């Protein structure tokens, strides 16, 4: 996974496969650990001027099953678009690599399905959440 400004890619004759459209982060009361992605996703969608229905792929980290279910239910994720090739409960999520793994999965799935937008989101310890929206190029 390589991130860089568009002009830096052009200068090196690299062809980007996606662009970061927007991101969001948020925190909730730590008693509700795992639900932080909800306001983070809402922030990212607002910044991108998009709705959940505009997303073609959703890669939502599964810290554990009930946490993933709560986020998906609260945000009304389409199960057909969410973790289409399996999530962390099935595949694992090495600490420190989760964001990169989810981003790569989302971008490659966008290309495979010729979709436009992908959402990547995960909870972070202490009630925090983070989300990013990518567009296929």
Language model segments and positions:
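Short glycine/threonine-rich loop-to-helix capping motif typified by GTGT followed
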Residues: 30-37, 62-80, 94-99, 130-137
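Conserved catalytic cysteine-centered active-site region
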Residues: 74-101, 106, 110-116
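Conserved beta-strand-centric core segments of catalytic alpha/beta enzyme folds
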Residues: 1-2, 99-137
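Phosphate/pyrophosphate-binding loops at sites that engage ATP/ADP/AMP, CoA/4′-phosphopantetheine
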Residues: 9-13, 42-56, 75-76
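Channel- or pocket-lining gating/hinge segments that regulate access to a cavity or pore
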Residues: 1-17
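Conserved small-residue
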Residues: 2, 20, 28, 41, ...
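Beta-strand segments within the central parallel beta-sheet cores of soluble alpha/beta enzyme folds
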Residues: 14-25, 53-62, 81-87, 116-123
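Active-site pocket-shaping loop/turn-to-helix segments
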Residues: 21-47, 60, 91-101, 105
